[in-house]
Structures are given as structure tokens and as C-alpha cells.
Amino acid sequence: MTDHRTRFLQLALDADALRFGEFTLKSGRLSPYFFNAGRFDSGAKTAQLAQCYADAIDAAGVEFDLLFGPAYKGIPLATALACAYAGRGRDLPLAFNRKEAKDHGEGGTLIGAPLQGRKVLIVDDVITAGTAIREALGIIRAAGGTPSGIVVALDRQEIASEQDRRSAAQAVAAEAGIPVIAVANLADLLAFAAGNADLVGFREPLLAYRGRYGTDTTG
């Protein structure tokens, strides 16, 4: 497992953003783990998280020249990532959307750098159903930008339904024709748990969950 994946999972565990136990998801599934990016709630935590994102993006080799953060969690993530890249000597333009259009001031739903003619990387925490990402894709194209990829913190690598054996990330990637980059995924989480004495007891529930809901790419 590459270093940024290990660093991210340890950071998430330390921040209580990654928790183990029994959690009922919005889908109704009973999950042995839960991820909440909202727990990266300080400058230091967010800065470290952004470095993990940047390392994952660089490892993937995707080409982009603008960062876009979908409202709401994508906004601070994209902003922190832009700061991380500035610290590496790459000053990237940044944009995001608001969910409610304004009829005064700058107006509209878009804030930040113009998207026209840009290769846009979408930055978010997770892809659950894909609704917010699909909305972001439409906004970017309508503004004259070209989506070039999507980056998220964690890919749960679980099927959308028994009828659609793809994950939400796989479905969005196929529909949009662009890569979805994850800082870490369920397979990484399993490897991380196996190497952590405090988490070994959660490995069997994780394996059982993957066996029931995992995509074909989690093995």
C-alpha cells in the first residue's frame, strides 16, 4: 500500500473521521465502519488531508488546470488542496458552486476562477449516490469547462444494488468518461486493519461486508 494511503487512513483514524463498530448507512445497510470527512475540523488536520489528496492525484497522473469544489464539503477540500499545491510551487485556479443562486453582488451559482477552456478536477469527500458529482459535471460543462477527473477521500467499493453491481464511483466514471481517484479504498482499509493491532478484530466484519456488498474490484 502506497504511503499516502497509509497516512490518510491513520490521519482519519486519529481524527475520529474513520470509526469502527456498527453503523446504519443511508442505504439501510449495516456497516462495520463509517467515514465522516467533517471530522477533519482544524487547520492542521485539513492541511495534512490535502497533502494526501495531492499525493494521490500526482500518483494517478491526471491532467488538470483548475480545481472545483462542489457545495458543500467539496469547497473546503478544494480550497485546502489549492493551498497544498501552492506550497509545492503550483498555483492553481479554484472555483466552487453555491446551492442557492444569488440575484445580487456577483450573482449566479458559481464563485471563483472562470471555468471556460479549463481542464477541471472535481474535489469531494466521497461518492455515495453520485448525485452531487453529476450536478457538478453539468455545471462545469455549462460554464465551458471540461471535466478531467474526480478525486475523493475514500471509495467504499460497494455495489449500488443487486441489479447494478458497479459502485457509484464506477458508474460515474463510466458515464462521464473520466477517472475517479480515491486517496484510499476498501481494499486499502482491509490491509490497514490487518497491520494495526488495535483494528485486527474488525477485519472479519470488514471481510464479511465486502463479501456481501463489495464490487468485483475489492478483492
Swiss-Prot record:
SUPFAM superfamilies, sorted: PRTase-like
Transmembrane segments: none
Pfam families: Pribosyltran
Known catalytic reactions: orotidine 5'-phosphate + diphosphate = orotate + 5-phospho-alpha-D-ribose 1-diphosphate
Lineage: Bacteria, Pseudomonadati, Pseudomonadota, Gammaproteobacteria, Lysobacterales
Biological function: Catalyzes the transfer of a ribosyl phosphate group from 5-phosphoribose 1-diphosphate to orotate, leading to the formation of orotidine monophosphate (OMP).
InterPro entries membership: OPRT (IPR023031), Or_phspho_trans_dom (IPR004467), PRibTrfase_dom (IPR000836), PRTase-like (IPR029057)
Pathway participation: Pyrimidine metabolism; UMP biosynthesis via de novo pathway; UMP from orotate: step 1/2
Molecular function GO terms recorded: magnesium ion binding; orotate phosphoribosyltransferase activity
Residues that hold 5-phospho-alpha-D-ribose 1-diphosphate according to the record: 26, 72-73, 98-99, 102, 104, 124-132
GO-annotated cellular components: cytoplasm
Encoding gene per record: pyrE
Descriptive protein name: Orotate phosphoribosyltransferase
